[in-house]
Amino acid sequence: MAPNPRKSHPLLKMINNSLIDLPTPPNISAWWNFGSLLALCLVTQILTGLLLAMHYTADTTLAFSSVAHTCRNVQYGWLIRNMHANGASFFFICIYMHIGRGFYYGSYLHKETWNTGVLLLLTLMATAFVGYVLPWGQMSFWGATVITNMFSAIPYIGQTIVEWAWGGFSVDNPTLTRFFALHFLLPFMIAGLTLIHLTFLHESGSNNPLGIVSNCDKIPFHPYYSLKDILGLALLLLPLTAMALFSPNLLGDPENFTPANPLVTPPHIKPEWYFLFAYAILRSIPNKLGGVLALAASVLVLLLCPFLHTSKQRTMAFRPLSQSLFWILVANLLILTWIGSQPVEHPFIIIGQLASTTYFIILLILFPITSALENKMLNF
């Protein structure tokens, strides 16, 4: 019989083993769709970003007007920009759902896959942050100033690091130039990390909603899940396109329609909605260094998940107490997101402090205790 190039060709063989003949659990739900949706988001962002970069000028005097020029004079420039800006929001919606699914179903017990995933999240956050600075509006400028200035909280070397990052004594032209370079580079780093993430995932195989080994009962990825993923892609592209066409500025900040002015501070500096939960945690601590450490901990706490797993069962599918705690955590994150968008005044300060404390207590204390309690209940 003639050899099948799909299975023998060095390149096609890799694609075949990852996307066609990949053995997949037969019972994975729609929550497992978000991996491929994230890949779609990345491709969309790189393509639209490449087209935008062709018309963008990384100079403080021209950046704002070059973005305006793209929207006004470039063929479909407005659409490309709207897809790129809102694509970032959908990217974060997908990654938060993906992390939530991993947390709920115990996927973090694949330690290498989970750790590369956390690294991907951090890289994505860095990419989104430097990208937000590029239009050089008021919120871009002041957001860059506030967030980069946090590094000055590091003892001894903090101020030096900040000035080194700025390329001067304030956020100015060198800062914008290097942020553009970083924003161009990081998505390709994300693409590389994604391949490492997938390599680790395919080493162990996918988890499933029951959390049990399904090696004896797997089905090929194509045509079953390839078709299911295409439905997911359509359901993602539909709201993204609708948003880009009908309400492109819904999630943006009106301040960013004003060109950057170092002499006028906006009344309320805040990042994009997807960083608000971390921003609320940062603001809830009155001490600068303490706030920065809490901000870092709010994301890095994910690295501890595999070590805090005390349950005999992998997923939360049959653990009602942990389920309740999980949804309380989700509600808590939504409260933090809301608090991050509010001004620093009573009652928002105390609500933010309570929500921040609750966030860490649930993750670090209540989940391990509840899991241990559920183990005890299994004996009765």
UniProtKB/Swiss-Prot annotation:
The keyword Nucleotide-binding does not apply. SUPFAM superfamilies: a domain/subunit of cytochrome bc1 complex (Ubiquinol-cytochrome c reductase) (SSF81648), Transmembrane di-heme cytochromes (SSF81342). InterPro entries: Cyt_b/b6_C, Cyt_b/b6_C_sf, Cyt_b/b6_N, Cytb/b6-like_sf, Cytochrome_b, Cytochrome_b_C_euk/bac, Cytochrome_b_N_euk/bac, Di-haem_cyt_TM. Heme b b566 binds at residues 98, 197. One of its GO terms (biological process) is mitochondrial electron transport, ubiquinol to cytochrome c. GO terms for cellular component: mitochondrial inner membrane; respiratory chain complex III. The chain crosses the membrane at residues 34-54, 78-99, 114-134, 179-199, 227-247, 289-309, 321-341, 348-368. Component of the ubiquinol-cytochrome c reductase complex (complex III or cytochrome b-c1 complex) that is part of the mitochondrial respiratory chain. The b-c1 complex mediates electron transfer from ubiquinol to cytochrome c. Contributes to the generation of a proton gradient across the mitochondrial membrane that is then used for ATP synthesis. This is Cytochrome b. The gene is MT-CYB.
